[in-house]
Amino acid sequence: MIIYEYSNKGCRVENQDYISHGSLPDDGYVCILTDGMGGYSAGDEAAKTVAESIRAYIQNNYTQTNIPNIINEAITYSNDELMLKRLSIGAQRMGCVLALLVVTKEYAYIDWLGDSRVYMFRNGKEVYRTEDHSMINEM
């Protein structure tokens, strides 16, 4: 599998995007994109902590029997790791948004939190786009 990465900080002073990816058994693959939350402390560290802990959890616990459950457990684990990181550096609040993809021979599984989107294209046309988790969308 060939992976390309691109990140653009836009009008921000600091780029708090982080991408982590790796191989899984049976030609599977995991890819996570995180972006530190503006207005919170150490967004870059939050993004890295969450992405790396999700990737490691999925790689260490991967089975093809219940991938959605493994993804949920990985997100919970990453939140625990983020809280430990927050305490270790003395930050008041840390957070990030995330988008993730797990690919197997048969399926692609996605999950996301916040306003980072996942798009699916078929024959050059957008056929699916995740909906942002935001206060406006919840109203």
Name each model-derived stretch.
Residues 1-139:
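PP2C/PPM-type serine/threonine phosphatase catalytic domain
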